Amino acid sequence: SKKFQTLALGATLALTTAFTAPAMAGKDFIKKDLSADLPLSKKKVLITAGPTYEPIDPVRFISNPSSGKMGFAIAEAARDAGAQVTLISGPVHLPTPDRVKRIDVISALDMHQASMDALNQTDIFIATAAVADFRVENSHNQKIKKQDNSGPGMTLTLVENPDIVAAVAQHEPKPFTVGFAAETRDVENYARQKIERKNLDMIVANDVSRQDIGFNSDQNAVTVIWKTGLQAMETASKAQIARDLVTLISAHYKKAR
């Protein structure tokens, strides 16, 4: 009868609600519980990546071959470790990782400003960007023509860019600060000098003169140095190096706090 069908339907809906709601609640509980166990859960991580362009005129600039691949890989690894990640990127040809906030910049001055603006409540700062040390003092608003020069050559006056990672390390409260040292010789020695001079917690050094792990390579090999020790990471994909770095950084961050 219609009355029986109505009662049966009501009972079915009641049973469905009774069993579905707790089941879904259980899934949410498990998801939250797993998230809480991640090493960087609820931590804010700020990462710089890629090169910077220092303009000479509207069509020429000073830069370097950095691809940004290492920084983007670290952003993904930090996100997977539970962090809230902000990625400040120079000009690169890479897609934005899912669930990562990306801020695009061009010059070293842009990156410095963006880093200081985003630094509030940052727990960990990782400076992978290959920032140009110098910029042209007076860049031209119009393209420079050959005939504009009175002689056979042209002289550019360069001025020093702000040291972003050193500025971050001086900030109060200071985030756990990780620098990168891309060197072509005496890699470990130069890295140790930087960690002291810039008051860093850790530094990641690599030899960019090697063709197999250079700027645009998909692989890397690094030595991670801190004030009381070091750890070498042999050649592997940048994704794997990134995961290993995030594991090591999170462990040292917890010890420091």
Q: Model segments located where?
A:
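Glycine-rich phosphate/diphosphate-binding loop of Rossmann-like nucleotide-binding domains
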Residues: 37-107, 119
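Glycine-rich phosphate/dinucleotide-binding loop and adjoining beta-alpha-beta core of small-molecule
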Residues: 27, 79, 84-214, 232, ...
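Internal gly/pro-rich beta-alpha loop/helix module
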Residues: 27-34
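C-terminal segment of classical bacterial N-terminal signal peptides
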Residues: 4, 15-23
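Generic hydrophobic/aromatic pocket-lining and core-packing "Φ" positions
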Residues: 59, 71, 75, 115, ...
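Bacterial N-terminal signal peptides that target proteins for export
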Residues: 1-8
